[in-house]
Amino acid sequence: MLQTGIKGTGEALVTEELSARAMGSGELPVYATPAMLALVEETAWKSVAPALEPGQGTVGTKLDFSHLAATPLGRKVRCETRLTEIDRRRLVFSAEVWDEAGKIGEGTHERFIVDSEKFLAKADAR
């Protein structure tokens, strides 16, 4: 059952592929903001997926996030999300991301519940 308070946890190892240099968001070999945001989205959707009806999925619609500190290559990062609000099909999550030295990111993320087949048909029709 979908209810507020659902928590999720995700982890990643910061590799060259997840660096700002490789992702094009900067020139330095540190954890890229786009990689951190992807980890937040993945952690959030996976946390609520078991509570959805068959045929439903979620799509990300909004991120309001601060990247607080740089993480060098080779470190592990951990994301924790919590579902804080449900407004019909809109889901709001709080999220925090840490590396081994401390918090590196925090913010909110919104997703919408969709009927997967209808959503894909509408996307294909665009």
Give a label for each model feature.
Residues 1-32:
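Catalytic strand-loop segment that frames the active site of acyl-thioester-processing enzymes
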Residues 2-9, 86-93, 99-126:
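C-terminal binding/interaction regions
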Residues 14-16, 67, 113:
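Hydrophobic residues in beta-strands and at strand termini
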Residues 27-35, 92, 114:
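Residues at secondary-structure transition points
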Residues 45-78:
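Hydrophobic beta-strand-centered segment that forms part of the acyl-chain substrate-binding groove
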Residues 65-100:
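Hydrophobic beta-sheet segments that form the core/acyl-binding groove
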